[in-house]
Design a protein with these regions (language model features):
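Aromatic-lined carbohydrate-binding/catalytic grooves of carbohydrate-active enzymes
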Residues: 37-198
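Glycan-recognition surfaces
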Residues: 141-147, 155, 159-161, 167, ...
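Short linear motifs in low-complexity or flexible loops
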Residues: 379, 383, 389-392, 396-403, ...
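C-terminal beta-strand-rich structural cap/linker in extracellular carbohydrate-active enzymes
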Residues: 430, 434-454
Length: 455
């Protein structure tokens, strides 16, 4: 039996084309970023190369910056109502090869390949009554014109009560399996925000997609967007998906980062193997070329540290949004810090300790578990813990300055510390308190090793 959790036992780490290229990434761009990842990032656990939205549109980006998505575009589809790569942008896909040559190249580097799709069936296929593989049904018979995206006009939702609906999803994921796809980001599905009264209106399509992946015979990470995901449906997301966005598009804006602490608190009990609430891409480095104006991130170095540390201690998937070939040394060093990445891969029982207008504190356990620290067995056990404290300025979310907060945190285990150090930030252990000084918008990250002796 297919175990969807086995597809993502750890939070996926990789690169996504959207933040830099918008809709207009090409095969050459993808290969260049894959080459960079293989050489500079793969040794640290980064492995997914994901082609984001509009890869089947030969004219994608033609109207930027005025219009993001070309209206009524004639994107590329095969004879069975399935989108295929635009060969003018992905030359190796010509002749029906699809993404297989590009996926093979990414795999040859020791990496994994992913794509973005929109929920539903192409409108042009519904309008042209094109057939669906495996059944005597045409696209118009399963298309639901009353289930559409608020922001992209390419697709109709699929009416899962209609004959042929599951066959359609089975056919597209069978195609992706034949290409060698390892990761699929499905958009307009975690929150169908066109319909405020029912933001989880695509529940049946989520189930159909999960079923199609199982039937494809290939393990694929299933990532659902956009957010915010519906917390009341956490049980359903955990059953069917590997990742789901807990926020709308996250960009390099301190207000969005500050709000992420609350979002992580809401979702902290739903993190585990194969189930990763997703804080969205990391907008650092060079961004925005495909949006009409290439630029550097608006986040300060302090804010970038805060972002990465929160993502890691919460155990969000990590998807770099930058153009990798233009990473500077400081950004590369941040993304390859083994100690903060170890909390992502090895952390357990991460939880918010406290949060107020001035600061937020999270704690995670490493080699041991929260339970082993609280109620240890008779033998000694070593547990590596990470603690994060991020500061902002009270009632001034956009303020940046040297002043911050000083926290005296009851560590509870300070007297058992055999070794400990700050990865970044100023930390001191006095008696049984952990004393932390944090500048505005910055973070303190402390790793300690405890010898826990049984009662």
């Amino acid at each position: 039996m297919y175990n969807k959790n086995a597809a993502a036992p750890l939070p996926p780490m990789g690169w996504n084309s959207y933040d830099y290229y918008n809709t207009a990434v090409t095969e050459a761009d993808v290969r260049a970023n894959a080459d960079y990842m293989a050489e500079h990032l793969a040794p640290y656990g980064w492995q997914y190369v994901v082609v984001d939205i509009q890869w089947s549109d030969p004219n994608a980006g033609a109207l930027v910056p005025d219009v993001q998505y070309v209206p009524f575009t004639q994107f590329c589809v095969d004879d069975w109502s399935r989108q295929i790569p635009a060969p003018n942008r992905f030359p190796s896909s010509a002749g029906g090869a699809g993404f297989k040559p590009l996926a093979d190249y990414v795999h040859s580097l020791g990496l994994k390949f992913g794509i973005h799709i929109m929920r539903g069936i192409p409108r042009i296929c519904a309008h042209n009554h094109t057939p669906i593989l495996g059944c005597d049904v045409t696209a118009d018979k399963i298309a639901n014109p009353f289930s559409i995206s608020k922001w992209n006009g390419d697709m109709y939702g699929v009416d899962m009560t209609k004959p042929g609906a599951q066959a359609y999803y089975d056919s597209i994921f069978a195609l992706y399996a034949s290409w060698g796809v390892d990761f699929v980001k499905v958009d307009d599905i975690a929150n169908t925000n066109m319909y405020a009264e029912n933001p989880y209106s695509a529940q049946k399509e989520i189930e159909a997609i999960a079923r199609a992946i199982e039937r494809s015979g290939r393990a694929m990470v299933l990532s659902l967007s956009p957010g915010p995901a519906v917390i009341e449906k956490a049980w359903h997301l955990e059953q069917h998906a590997n990742m789901w966005r807990i926020t709308d598009d996250f960009w390099d804006d301190w207000r969005l980062l500050r709000a992420m602490f609350e979002r992580c608190e809401v979702w902290q009990k739903h993190v585990g193997a194969g189930c990763w609430p997703d804080c969205d891409m990391l907008p650092l480095g060079r961004l925005g070329k495909g949006f009409g104006a290439e630029r550097g991130t608006n986040f300060t170095e302090a804010e970038q540290r805060t972002m990465l540390t929160l993502w890691c201690i919460f155990r969000s998937p990590l998807m770099i949004g930058a153009e990798l070939t233009k990473l500077d040394d400081a950004t590369l060093a941040l993304l390859t810090n083994r100690e903060v990445l170890r909390v992502l891969t090895d952390g357990r029982a991460a939880a918010q300790v406290r949060r107020d207008e001035a600061s937020c504190v999270w704690k995670s356990y490493g080699a041991g578990t929260a339970e082993s620290v609280v109620s240890p067995p008779a033998a000694e056990k070593h547990a590596a813990g990470g603690l994060l404290a991020a500061a902002s300025k009270r009632n001034a979310a956009d303020a940046r300055g040297a002043a911050g907060v000083d926290l005296a945190l009851h560590h509870g285990l300070a007297k058992d510390v055999a070794d400990g150090h700050g990865v970044w930030g100023i930390v001191a252990v006095l008696d049984d308190e952990l004393v932390v000084g944090v500048p505005n918008h910055d973070v303190c990250f402390f790793v300690s090793f405890h010898t826990v002796v049984g009662q």
